[in-house]
Amino acid sequence: MKKLTLKKSERIRKRRSYLQIYQHGKRSFTKHFTIVVSENDLDFPRLGMTVTKKIGNAVKRNRIKRLIREFFRLNKDRFKASQDIVIIAKGNTSSMKYADVCRELGVLLTKEPQNITQE
């Protein structure tokens, strides 16, 4: 049986890593998220998130982060193995349901990063 965990090594944690991804990655936009994808030298995908104070208070920001992490945790085997993915939440995401987050981020799994422009 496959483990559906999100290990510490599968997260992007260092500021230096975020800056490198922002500088060299390909940006894609959906209605509620901006996605930056960059190649890495590892054998597994890594997730990073940015949720600013424009989203709302800490409760709302943490809720969005939990939803994004859950989507990634359940779908990480469908991402390319050597990718760093940073998901930036836009200001109107705080009231989204998990199904809406899955539907919108599911676009990542079916299209190339430069082609994702769903508004």
Swiss-Prot record:
It catalyses: Endonucleolytic cleavage of RNA, removing 5'-extranucleotides from tRNA precursor. GO terms for biological process: tRNA 5'-leader removal. GO terms for molecular function: 3'-tRNA processing endoribonuclease activity; ribonuclease P activity; tRNA binding. InterPro entries: Ribosomal_Su5_D2-typ_SF (IPR020568), Ribsml_uS5_D2-typ_fold_subgr (IPR014721), RNase_P (IPR000100), RNase_P_CS (IPR020539). It comes from the Bacteria. Keywords: Endonuclease, Hydrolase, Nuclease, RNA-binding, tRNA processing. Its EC number is 3.1.26.5. It holds the Pfam family Ribonuclease_P. RNaseP catalyzes the removal of the 5'-leader sequence from pre-tRNA to produce the mature 5'-terminus. It can also cleave other RNA substrates such as 4.5S RNA. The protein component plays an auxiliary but essential role in vivo by binding to the 5'-leader sequence and broadening the substrate specificity of the ribozyme. It is an enzyme of class 3 (hydrolase). One of its GO terms (cellular component) is ribonuclease P complex. Belongs to the RnpA family. Consists of a catalytic RNA component (M1 or rnpB) and a protein subunit. This is Ribonuclease P protein component. Coiled coil: none annotated. It comes from Syntrophus aciditrophicus (strain SB).
